[in-house]
């Protein structure tokens, strides 16, 4: 009976290092490439979402895990494009999304998947018809390669995006319904684990 407290203390102290191996939160920051049709400018007579555009920028995410695998992600991005060929000279897109995440640790790497809901705010420097704030959802995943116990490299994160884009009716006063647009986002960067 006198050895029971010592045995309990020994088992707890052996368990603590194992708990330290599971990180409860991750912060990601890196590069973002987005390909999406940003909208139909006022110089286009179209009933669709306009030409697809490549945008470069940044991505940041914070993920908190409830256990070893299941967590919640908040992701923010900013993507930018400038073109003299289109009716707008620059486009700035900012997304803010939240949703569940699931990670699959495998050796010195972790694959993950997430489903995010949120919004997109788009601004144009010269054409306000492509400026809007809309609902946006995305599903995707990626791979984190551990560089050390607290730092990982994320070489790939791919997200499929879906949003609605307002269409400008240049032929009359009747408003046209918004058009659904599919997009893709690639991100890569560094993950810090806490």
Question: Residues of each region from the PLM?
Answer:
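Internal, hydrophobic beta-strand segments that form the core of beta-sheet-rich folds
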Residues: 157-158
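Short acidic/His/Gly/Ser-rich catalytic and metal-binding motifs that mark active-site loops
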Residues: 36-39, 83, 122-124, 163-167
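Gram-negative (and chloroplast) outer-membrane scaffold detector with strong preference
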Residues: 26, 61-138, 145-147, 153-154, ...
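Surface-exposed strand-loop-strand hairpins of Gram-negative outer-membrane beta-barrel proteins
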Residues: 35-59, 132
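Extracellular loop and loop/strand-boundary signature of outer-membrane beta-barrel proteins
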Residues: 43-49, 83-88, 123-130, 171-178
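Transmembrane beta-strand segments of Gram-negative outer membrane beta-barrel proteins
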Residues: 21-37
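Subset of outer-membrane beta-barrel
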Residues: 146, 150-152, 162-167, 178-181
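Cleavable N-terminal export/targeting peptides
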Residues: 1-23
